[in-house]
From Swiss-Prot:
This is Zinc finger protein 211. Residues 33-106 form the KRAB domain. Pfam families: KRAB (PF01352), zf-C2H2 (PF00096), zf-C2H2_6 (PF13912). The keyword Nucleotide-binding does not apply. Keywords: DNA-binding, Metal-binding, Nucleus, Repeat, Transcription, Transcription regulation, Zinc, Zinc-finger. The lineage of its organism: Eukaryota, Metazoa, Chordata, Craniata, Vertebrata. GO terms for cellular component: nucleus. Belongs to the krueppel C2H2-type zinc-finger protein family. It comes from Homo sapiens (Human). GO terms for biological process: regulation of transcription by RNA polymerase II. May be involved in transcriptional regulation. A zinc finger (C2H2-type) spans 131-157, 257-279, 285-307, 313-335, 341-363, 369-391, 397-419, 425-447, 453-475, 481-503, 509-531, 537-559.
Amino acid sequence: MLGFPPGRPQLPVQLRPQTRMATALRDPASGSVTFEDVAVYFSWEEWDLLDEAQKHLYFDVMLENFALTSSLGCWCGVEHEETPSEQRISGERVPQFRTSKEGSSSQNADSCEICCLVLRDILHLAEHQGTNCGQKLHTCGKQFYISANLQQHQRQHITEAPFRSYVDTASFTQSCIVHVSEKPFTCREIRKDFLANMRFLHQDATQTGEKPNNSNKCAVAFYSGKSHHNWGKCSKAFSHIDTLVQDQRILTREGLFECSKCGKACTRRCNLIQHQKVHSEERPYECNECGKFFTYYSSFIIHQRVHTGERPYACPECGKSFSQIYSLNSHRKVHTGERPYECGECGKSFSQRSNLMQHRRVHTGERPYECSECGKSFSQNFSLIYHQRVHTGERPHECNECGKSFSRSSSLIHHRRLHTGERPYECSKCGKSFKQSSSFSSHRKVHTGERPYVCGECGKSFSHSSNLKNHQRVHTGERPVECSECSKSFSCKSNLIKHLRVHTGERPYECSECGKSFSQSSSLIQHRRVHTGKRPYQCSQCGKSFGCKSVLIQHQRVHIGEKP
């Protein structure tokens, strides 16, 4: 009964139900088993990791396990004298889903810190799918498995505008599919998640507020007897007033659960508990390949793809694949051109909110990440991590072709294109292609003329922030890069690289026409004009043209009477 049917997708082995329940089913006297013992807890990150088939399988298995534990008469692990048919399960007494059974059976429901909406909805479903061991309402004879639902129903008889429930015999999986795919919940300001949607509002009832019928499209619906609850600041509709209160918390920040370490606010206590793991030393998931530990199972799974090379999320537009779903979602905005996040300072827009937040630091000058070795600070955390490898010498990313290693994975990806010749970034204006997205972005500014970085001293503008930084050293006189051969200093590293060729004699740029080589690419470009006859620099006074800008400047001195 606990096994997974042939052909059905498998849950990750760490998340499968424990074997204690199977033992208890074979020999009930061997020990009491509770639903907590076999239930599986998912954090929000872990839940997002599952695909739709696995989510449906999870609900199937949990519902089946719930029915079995209920039939054994050992629901929540709290000892009392009631018979199974008299046991009450309060809507507020929802057990914890755990991967570890430690302490789960000794805690009563009132001390439970994690209250998951998923289980509550599973219990609602169990009530409506024919479980006949619940409580009986003497007023009208209707039976309920959950005492909270009994209390809500009793309000009908005292005219308290109760929440009502109407169901048919549609399967739980059908309900999942309908409400995940049709997405009947709308909100302009709040990002809805799947677990909040497990209230199972009928599509028609959401739109009209009318009582849903026994359509096979909806397994269970809960809503107010008169109309849905709405809040003036948000268009989202709710079937339960407690969900509305939670939604109001998101917008007003009232009654939130706040982390004492960092001040982050959560709308649910269970979310706060999950968040607090970030601050704790608890890292229960260890990678067998490299020994790295992780706080969340989802982070562990994603990390393993570094070793396996698995990239399960493919872009339907270009076929490019990714190891994480959010990376795919971010990538798809490249095709759609969607850039919804705009900077209020300069108007620049971004496809991701995190990119906008990082960009804002250009204007504010904030650099919150500081190196403990040299005191250098950075605006982004990953920049600090990369910088620290300068001190440690760590170069973990190695090329399989030539053995060259790199401190950044992105550098390795770019390097591999030297071997493959791949140039995936093509300009739609001129057709020129590039190996790196940064080079492509820089090139596009040639066509747009965009120069967003302005010098505060002289007003000169630049297309790149790095160019502005180098330029500002003209005003400050800073020359932080020094030659180890002759102690000559330079304002930027690129100038040092060019200078070092004076000492090494390296001349990497060779003319394909005559074989002459040069130490700088600009010198090769000027030399090629000898073969092509191109003279792009023209004198405005006499119309004479030149192949080199410096020669034009010298020529112009003839007109102004200045001696060259």
